[in-house]
């Protein structure tokens, strides 16, 4: 468990991120509310964040209550037998990438693989999902990879909203010696911000306003 007062560097959270998927990770923070962004702390890891309510400046009736609940939560997760609910006996785990525009094909692939004894875990290609998938491949979670959506790579080239990926995207399966199928799903567009904030170059292209915050622009 890590505490994260707003003015203290995040080294302790970095240590928490080093733990593999499934190990309970809990962060109590003074900034876990409002407009604070947590991507720099959690990145691709399964970290639970709890607001401290009061400032972390010693123990009192408020901070004791918060810390107690956090400690009990971590202890309960550590003592639970997660495998009873997470492991599907006899199923071979396979990682798959997908996004909205490739959902129909992805669902058919999932149905086919499940009929043949595989358990498919899908990762949303939003700039975090792809690297979360790569990290878990490197942790040895999966036995194969169906990379149906490479949208994040194109978004990285044009600095789209889903382009915050690491250099080892597409490389983990090969590094682990796993079978991998790659398809250029959703590689033909980038996800940008609101229409009225697009650059002149982007405005001259075909586009679809996905919602008020996101615009899909043809590459």
For every predicted segment, state its role.
Residues 1-31:
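N-terminal glycine-rich phosphate/adenylate-binding segment common to multiple enzyme folds
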Residues 20-25, 43-47, 89-94, 116-118, ...:
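Short coil/turn connectors at secondary-structure junctions
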Residues 26-30, 50-52, 147-148, 183:
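Generic beta-sheet signal
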Residues 32-35, 125-131:
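Short acidic loop-to-helix transition motifs that present clustered carboxylates
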Residues 35-101:
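Cap/lid and interdomain-hinge subdomains that line or gate substrate/regulatory clefts
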Residues 94-127, 138:
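Glycine-rich phosphate/diphosphate-binding loop of Rossmann-like nucleotide-binding domains
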Residues 131-142:
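N-terminal small/polar loop signature for handling phosphorylated ligands or for N-terminal nucleophile
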Residues 147-219:
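A glycine- and small/hydrophobic-rich beta-loop-beta segment
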């Amino acid at each position: 468990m890590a505490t994260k007062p707003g003015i203290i560097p995040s080294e302790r959270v970095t240590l928490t991120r080093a733990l593999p998927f499934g190990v309970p990770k809990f962060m109590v923070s003074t900034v876990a509310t409002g407009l604070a962004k947590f991507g720099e702390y959690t990145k691709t890891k399964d970290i639970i964040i709890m607001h401290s309510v009061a400032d972390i400046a010693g123990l009192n009736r408020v901070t004791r209550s918060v810390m107690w609940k956090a400690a009990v939560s971590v202890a309960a997760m550590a003592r639970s037998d997660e495998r009873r609910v997470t492991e599907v006996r006899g199923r071979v785990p396979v990682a798959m990438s997908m996004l909205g525009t490739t959902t129909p094909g992805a669902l058919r692939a999932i149905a086919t693989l499940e009929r043949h004894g595989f358990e498919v875990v899908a990762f949303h290609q939003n700039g975090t999902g792809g690297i979360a998938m790569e990290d878990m491949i490197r942790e040895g979670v999966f036995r194969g990879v169906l990379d149906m959506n490479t949208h994040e790579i194109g978004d990285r080239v044009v600095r789209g909203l889903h382009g915050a990926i690491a250099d080892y995207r597409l490389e983990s399966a090969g590094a682990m010696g796993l079978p991998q199928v790659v398809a250029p799903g959703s590689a033909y567009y980038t996800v940008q911000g609101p229409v009225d904030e697009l650059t002149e170059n982007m405005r001259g292209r075909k586009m679809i306003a996905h919602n008020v915050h996101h615009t899909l622009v043809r590459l």
